[in-house]
Structures are given as structure tokens and as C-alpha cells.
């Protein structure tokens, strides 16, 4: 992995009681030795693999103003990180769920792009076996479960300040209040809505297939083509490119997919991040609620799975063997 650390600083927030978060600030930057580089490479990998929301700085963002001064050489990176950690402590202290953690600021390069990554990591205890086969306690950074993380694409921010996607952050599992506090600290608001872009793509694909007057099998083949392309982009960490996708669908219609989406006004970006959960709808139907979870391949609709919208009834012909076995055992037992 071609990751080069420019500057990295660690600080700590310690929760002493319900009211106070103690601030512990380093007096110097971390030396980017092999261990530190390995840690950042792992954090970069874990973060890149997670679903993210996109945002941009508000005009009054204190962090953005301080970062701009640091980038212009008017403030040292260590001083910037120390002041930012103080603001983070003040913001976090407003919330009853406030917990401590290791606060990390890292400015690094990856594939010719400069980033600033900000994270609050948990420092956990565990056990290890030493060379004498004795058990000893140890501490480690819980990188795999890091959920308070944001990353600023410094290259995008500085070359295209009107962008709505140079800032990314984790959203969802940690809860709304946690996301709110971190966005307040960053002085940022949500920008590009990747899920909405992916939903728009799915609708455009279905409309494109209908416009081309494809039969059911051909429509499903088109969806499978789109899914294969998008999933390949997702696995490679690349964005969905409308021009490239249009080339994949070149034989579907006389008009290109890109021309079709522009003419119909879907308002899709020329490129946008793939959203795994939304794209899955191209090949599967899934839903849950009221104690029921259903998931089946889209191609089975109308063949083995039938839906009657008038009665909202789903009929399944031929149940999976393991489900059938459970049903038979339960009914034969009289329960």
C-alpha cells in the first residue's frame, strides 16, 4: 500500500467522572516509523471499506479556518491538532454519552491524493501469551470498530472548493446524536447524497430497459450487467462512472444510457460512490418486519415467487430444503 505519512499526532480524552473529560496532549508529533505506518495503513483500509456519508465545511467552521492556516504554514500541525482536540473535548462534553478515547490527527498521501484523517479510537484491554507461555495483559487500538472517523480530501478541498464531497464521515451504526456531535465539531453539513444517487441510478436503469422495450429476461440481464460493473467499481474502491457504465450497456438501445439519463433529467452526477445496500436491489428483493425476513433473487419473481398487489400476498412455490425440514419437524410434532 502506497501510503506516506506527512504528519501525525495523538492526544487523549479521559473520562474521570460523569461531568469531566480530562485532556491529555502530546508535546510532540509521532515519529512515522514502520509501526505507525502499519497502523495508519490498517486504519485507511478499514475506513475505505466502510459505508460513508459525504459533506462539506460550513462557512463558519472553526476547524476549516484553522486547517487553512495550517496548510498555509501559519500554524504548526501539532498546535493545530492540540487546539482541535480541545474543541472536540468542549463539543463532546455537551452530550451525556460522552466517552474518552485516543484522538488521532494524520495528514498523509495515498495514490497522489493528500488527506487529513481525524478519528476517536477506543483503547481496549486484552490478553496475550508471551514467549514463556505466560498470559499477560495488553492494550490495543480498536481500529476495526472505529466509528467516529472523518477524512478530508485536502487535494479536492483546495483545488475544487465548490465540491460537496471532499469530506467523508462514518454514519449510521453510531447513532444520530454521535454523528451530530462530530459534524458540529467539524463545522460541516452533509453534501452529496450517495444513496440518493444510487437510487436514481436504479430507477434510470429500469426506465432505460423499459424504453428499449426489453422483455423480462433481457431487463434482468441489463440489471445484472449494471450490478456487475458497479460491484467491480465498489471492490476496487472506485466510483461509478456514467460514461463507462454507458459503454457497458452499448448494445441495449440505439441511444446511449448516458444520453438517456441526461434527456430524462435524473440529475445523476458524472461519477458518484457506489452504495452496496442500494445496488443489491438490482439482483435481489429483500425486506423484513413484523417478525418476517424475506430475501430472494430477482429472477425468481414471476417464476417461483408471485406477488398479488391486490391482497398483498406473496406466494412461494418450492421452499428451501432446510426451511422445509424445519416446517415438517414442527408440524409433525404438533406444535
From Swiss-Prot:
Please name the GO terms that the record assigns under molecular function.
double-stranded DNA binding; single-stranded RNA binding
Gene Ontology, cellular component aspect: bacterial nucleoid; cytoplasm
Q: Which UniProt keywords apply?
A: Cytoplasm
The subcellular location is:
Cytoplasm, Nucleoid
Q: What is its main location?
A: cytoplasm
Name a Pfam family for this protein: NA37
- For the keyword S-adenosyl-L-methionine, the answer is no
PANTHER family per UniProt? NUCLEOID-ASSOCIATED PROTEIN YEJK, PTHR38772
Q: To which protein family does this belong?
A: Belongs to the YejK family.
Q: What is the protein named?
A: Nucleoid-associated protein KPK_1538
Q: To which species is this protein native? A: Klebsiella pneumoniae (strain 342)
